[in-house]
């Protein structure tokens, strides 16, 4: 009986420690940027067309997109109490999606909330789809 109680105590301690680690922001995923994704299109595109595709893709997914300079868009996604901000540098041949900042996504030491990477991947997939439109 003592062994069983000891096992339950150990299990309880492990559960509490895991919960504490999660609340401290541990256990997040490494931030995955999209770096120099090649622009695939049925015909060569101008920089303005790439910009339009990126802006439309982001907006259609709920991102607020703003041109902050030539060849640079900033995307902001607000979901409930979470905010993700990315920089999207682009040219006629490639684009990137790079983590800039966040609120309530537990970013620390290059790791972040598990949902962040899927939001960025969805954005990249949507951009790719828009670039393929005739």
Regions found by a protein language model. Name each.
Residues 2-3, 18-23, 130:
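N-terminal charge/polar-biased segments
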Residues 1-12:
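Bacterial N-terminal signal peptides that target proteins for export
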Residues 24-134:
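Ser/Thr-rich, low-complexity intrinsically disordered terminal regions
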Residues 10-20:
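Bacterial N-terminal signal peptides
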């Amino acid at each position: 009986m003592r062994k069983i109680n000891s096992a339950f105590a150990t299990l309880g301690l492990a559960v509490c420690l895991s919960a504490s680690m999660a609340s401290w922001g541990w256990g997040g995923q490494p931030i995955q940027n999209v770096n120099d994704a090649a622009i695939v299109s049925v015909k060569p595109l101008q920089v303005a067309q790439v910009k339009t595709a990126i802006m439309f893709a982001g907006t259609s997914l709920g991102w607020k997109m703003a041109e902050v300079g030539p060849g640079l868009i900033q995307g902001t996604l607000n979901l409930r109490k979470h905010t993700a901000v990315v920089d999207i540098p682009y040219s006629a041949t490639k684009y990137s999606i790079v983590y800039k900042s966040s609120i309530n996504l537990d970013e620390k030491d290059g790791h972040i909330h598990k949902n962040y990477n899927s939001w960025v991947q969805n954005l990249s997939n949507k951009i790719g789809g828009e670039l393929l439109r005739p």
